[in-house]
Design a protein with these regions (language model features):
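Class I S-adenosyl-L-methionine
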Residues: 2, 60-70, 80-269, 278-283, ...
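Nucleotide donor/acceptor-binding cores
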Residues: 5
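Structural recognition of the beta-strand scaffold that forms the well-ordered cores
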Residues: 8-10, 72-73, 116
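SAM cofactor-binding core of SAM-dependent methyltransferases
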Residues: 8-58
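Short glycine-/small-residue-rich Rossmann-like dinucleotide-binding loops
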Residues: 76
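Beta-strand acidic-aromatic groove motif in beta-rich domains, primarily in extracellular
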Residues: 274-276
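FAD-binding beta-loop-beta segment adjacent to the flavin cofactor pocket
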Residues: 289-299
Length: 299
């Protein structure tokens, strides 16, 4: 591939970071990845083609990692996420997120020119910032300069309210890195919907009844304004909930198509896919509208 960027993708998942390189039309070749989840591995290979897998990051021998120009290491977020257990990333703590520290030996041995990391913004929160800085100091001792910033996907053409911290680290002398400017975009859920989603994503009539009952209790006028609005928004448009207020959770929320999705998380069977309303909503006629989950492709 000539001067293609050689990439190693640790904590690869389904390969979203190498996918970004494809979208940006950056000539590259993934020379190895590291992933242990069998379904993620299957998805990765289907999307990107068969790729050498280094396996468990905690068992990788640094000298056996192929030389690379870019190493990505977006480690598990569960121990730093506000919805997780907050056990942190302290070296030697044994938490999922502390797997980060197994990257240290690999980076020291291979010294890629570029490093890329993405994680939840709470990594910069008061409970975790100290250990994050310790990691930054390690990279600086190897000769890297670190640039990090919290970015929101909705500012870059993705209809999802998703704030994440990104860190780019560059080895040796270089022109100072600048993160992309915010884009003036108005992409909303409506823009990414499939034309003919499978019937299995549509909710049962009982859910529609509960939705209407709760809307009437909360006041229909505001909901109707949101449903009928055609103005695009860079915010989530929360129309109502299928569940009573005391059970109010993301699982029951119905969102407007003219806004952005809430932050997507791993569903783990929790019925937490964002749900939208379709059709000409008439609260007196159940057949005037449908409620459905976003499909995996839409997510």
């Amino acid at each position: 591939m000539g001067d293609a960027l050689k990439v190693v993708e640790l904590f690869a998942g389904i390969g979203t970071q190498s996918m970004a390189l494809k979208v940006l039309d950056i000539k590259h070749k993934v020379v190895a990845m590291s992933e242990i989840d069998k379904y993620a591995i299957q998805s990765y290979n289907l999307i990107h083609g068969e790729t050498p897998n280094l396996g468990d990051v905690s068992k990788i021998v640094p000298s056996e990692v192929p030389d690379c120009d870019l190493l990505t290491y977006s480690f598990p977020c569960i121990s730093v996420s506000v919805s997780g257990n907050q056990d942190g990333i302290k070296q030697g703590s044994g938490t999922s997120s502390s797997l980060l520290w197994y990257c240290k030996g690999i980076i020291e041995a291979k010294k890629p020119k570029y490093l890329l990391m993405e994680n939840v913004k709470n990594l910069l929160g008061k409970n975790h910032y100290k250990h994050f800085q310790e990691w930054c100091n390690v990279l600086e001792s190897f000769g890297y300069t670190n640039y990090y910033k919290v970015l929101n996907a909705k500012h870059y053409g993705v209809p999802q309210n998703r704030e994440r911290v990104f860190m780019v680290s560059i080895l040796g002398e270089h022109k100072p890195y600048q993160f992309p400017d915010l884009e003036d975009v108005s992409t909303c859920i409506e823009d990414i919907l499939e034309d003919n989603p499978d019937k299995k994503y549509y909710l049962a009539e009982d859910n529609k009844k509960k939705f209407i009952e709760n809307l009437k209790e909360a006041g229909l006028e505001t909901a109707l304004e949101k449903i009928n609005s055609t103005e695009k928004s860079t915010q989530t448009v929360n129309i109502g909930n299928m569940y009573n207020n005391k059970y109010d959770s993301q699982a029951g929320r119905i969102y407007g198509r003219n806004g952005v999705s809430p932050t997507l998380s791993t569903m783990n069977g929790g019925n937490r896919q964002p749900k939208i309303i379709e059709g000409k909503f008439d609260p007196d006629h159940l057949d005037s509208f449908e409620l459905r989950k976003l499909t995996p492709l839409e997510c």
